[in-house]
Regions:
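C-terminal catalytic domains of large/alpha subunits in multi-subunit enzymes
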Residues: 1-116
Length: 116
């Protein structure tokens, strides 16, 4: 991920990993039910958020510096950009594995799918 100048590399790695985990939850487990008035109908603990012991250890953050950018401190924000490609990549991998294209998230019939 291009960050311009890596001011705090450890923090950047944490942001990348956090964005990936957030998007994994969106793709695989998280459901945020609301009523017709947009009021949440589930308690926080029932939303399907990943717990720390459920996060795969294989997330590898690769920080790419691009010095000389004409921005404040030479740094570029990294927060949300890391979460954008993950859910579509997981959905495509699921399609390649099963041959079934799904159009709703979280994906169904996966080991992570919410239990009924």
């Amino acid at each position: 991920h291009d960050v311009g100048k890596a001011v705090n590399p450890l923090s950047i790695e944490g942001q990348i990993e956090g964005g990936v985990v957030m998007s994994m939850g969106y793709a695989l487990t998280e459901k945020y039910p609301i009523d017709e008035n947009c009021k949440p109908t589930a308690k926080y603990g029932m939303l399907g958020l990943f717990r720390a012991n459920q996060i795969p250890p294989e997330i590898q953050a690769i920080v790419v510096e691009k010095p000389g950018l004409n921005v404040a401190g030479g740094a570029i924000g990294i927060g949300e950009i890391t979460s954008i490609p993950t859910a579509p990549a997981i959905a495509e991998a699921y399609y390649q594995f099963t041959g079934e294209r799904e159009f709703d998230l979280p994906l169904k019939n996966t080991p992570y799918a919410p239990k009924k």
